[in-house]
From Swiss-Prot:
Annotated source species: Pseudomonas putida (strain ATCC 47054 / DSM 6125 / CFBP 8728 / NCIMB 11950 / KT2440)
GO cellular component: a single term: cytoplasm
HAMAP family: RNA_methyltr_RlmN
Cofactor (UniProt): [4Fe-4S] cluster
PANTHER family found in the cross-reference section: 23S RRNA METHYLTRANSFERASE, RADICAL SAM CORE DOMAIN-CONTAINING PROTEIN
Binding site for S-adenosyl-L-methionine: 170-171, 202, 224-226, 302
Gene name per UniProt: rlmN
GO MF annotations, alphabetized: 4 iron, 4 sulfur cluster binding; metal ion binding; rRNA (adenine(2503)-C2-)-methyltransferase activity; rRNA binding; tRNA (adenine(37)-C2)-methyltransferase activity; tRNA binding
Cellular localisation: Cytoplasm
Protein's recorded name: Dual-specificity RNA methyltransferase RlmN
E.C. number(s) listed in UniProt: 2.1.1.192
UniProt xrefs under InterPro entries: Aldolase_TIM, Methyltransferase_A, RlmN_N, RNA_MTrfase_RlmN, rRNA_lsu_MTrfase_RlmN/Cfr, rSAM
Alphabetical list of SUPFAM superfamilies matching this protein: Radical SAM enzymes
Length: 381
């Protein structure tokens, strides 16, 4: 992608795109691997630091290209070790990236959009509307910046980040091409070399793009379910009015079937007091998912101002988990992490600039979510 300087930002190029770039400037394709290693393995953003690249080529690159990550506005560290970065992107808006450490892994939660058009009623990101899609460089740049922050370069030595989840701000499948490109870089050995089983894309249910996904990439899939029936899900997750549960689950099953192997769908379910946390909801969920190979991740609601929802009691949370477990499901309840720095699930809000233009974009992308058409670049692969 060309930046405001008129130069190509190499940070967001996949390996084939990087090879094409070097072709276009009359250089050998093997240079793509050299430069990608400098960018992603060593966190270099200055061509002058690339010691195995000749001076003439470095000067040539300086003239036509750059390595420009998004800007870190702030970094907060929670008492539990969770980190949150506020990152400014080219649109002027800010997005948030969260790192969650546990005993055996370090998970980076990456944003795909500034704001979100899907307007899920319990999510603070949706309350701010939609501003812009992130570029591939801005998506993968969150991984690049986190590695730099931890000092884990080379990136594949004693890495802090073992897993990446596309569960930050935005609906990843409404930024299809850029998210796919970024995930390919995450998994490429010339990028971050993260296993495909450790890269997860979470969607609220953009069915045409789920159907398209397996043609482009093989990653783990998570579904933001949040309700066990269409009537309730229509209220909580409005895209359900376009793609109801039967169609949505068939699409998810189709994705897993196409890729083969022992695939398991991660089902995310935010528990809202007296809304979707009752025994009848658990019973409906057991019936809904009976034939779906899945694991269920319960997420107690993380309150934010004016949400209109409350977190269930610990007893209600345990009761719901026990009912699902007795129904034969592998169920975990997500421990709230980073809520003292507003980094918990559902709390990411960033900062969206230019509210009038944002509203226009919001309306446009809401229409897109209701009437999805594949982008030309997706259809041509």
């Amino acid at each position: 992608m060309t930046t405001s300087t008129g130069k190509i930002n190499l940070l967001g190029l996949t390996q084939p795109e990087m090879e094409q770039f070097f072709d276009s400037i009359g250089e050998k394709r093997f240079r793509a691997g050299q430069v990608m290693k400098w960018i992603h393995h060593f966190g270099v953003s200055d061509f002058a630091a690339m010691t195995n690249v000749g001076k003439v080529l470095r000067e040539k690159l300086e003239a036509v290209a750059e390595i420009r990550p998004p800007e870190v506005v702030s970094e907060d560290i929670s008492a539990d070790g969770t980190r949150k970065w506020v990152i400014r992107v080219a649109s002027g808006s800010c997005v948030e990236t969260v790192y969650i450490p546990t005993d055996d892994r370090g998970t980076l939660c990456v944003s795909s959009q500034a704001g979100c058009a899907l307007d899920c009623s319990f999510c603070s990101t949706g309350k701010q509307g939609f501003n812009s899609n992130l570029t591939a460089a801005e998506v993968i740049g969150q991984v690049w910046l986190a590695n730099k922050s931890f000092g884990t370069v080379p990136a594949k030595v004693d890495r802090a980040i073992t897993n990446v989840v596309m569960m930050g701000m935005g609906e990843p499948l409404l930024n299809f091409d850029n998210v796919i490109a970024a995930m390919k870089i995450m998994m490429d050995d010339l990028g971050y070399g993260i296993s495909k089983r450790r890269v997860t894309l979470s969607t609220s249910g953009v069915v045409p793009m789920i159907d398209e996904l397996a043609k482009h990439i093989d990653v783990s899939l998570a579904l933001s379910l949040h309700a066990p029936n269409d009537e309730l899900r229509n209220k909580l997750v409005p895209i359900n009015k376009k793609y109801p549960l039967k169609v949505l689950l068939e699409s998810c099953m189709g994705y897993m079937s196409t890729l083969g192997g022992k695939r398991v769908l991660t089902v995310e379910y935010t528990l809202l007091k007296d809304v979707n946390d009752q025994p009848e909801h658990a019973a409906q969920m057991i019936e809904l998912l009976r034939d779906v190979p899945c694991k269920i991740n319960l997420i107690p609601f993380n309150p934010f101002p004016h949400s209109g929802y409350e977190r269930p009691s610990n007893n209600a949370i345990r009761r719901f988990q026990d009912l699902l477990h007795h129904g034969g499901f592998n169920v975990t309840t997500r421990t709230t992490r980073g809520d003292d720095i507003d980094a918990a699930c559902g709390q990411l809000v960033g900062q969206v600039n230019d509210r009038t233009r944002r509203s226009e974009r919001y309306i446009a992308v809401r229409q897109l979510s209701a009437d999805v058409e594949l982008p030309d670049s997706a259809a041509s692969h």
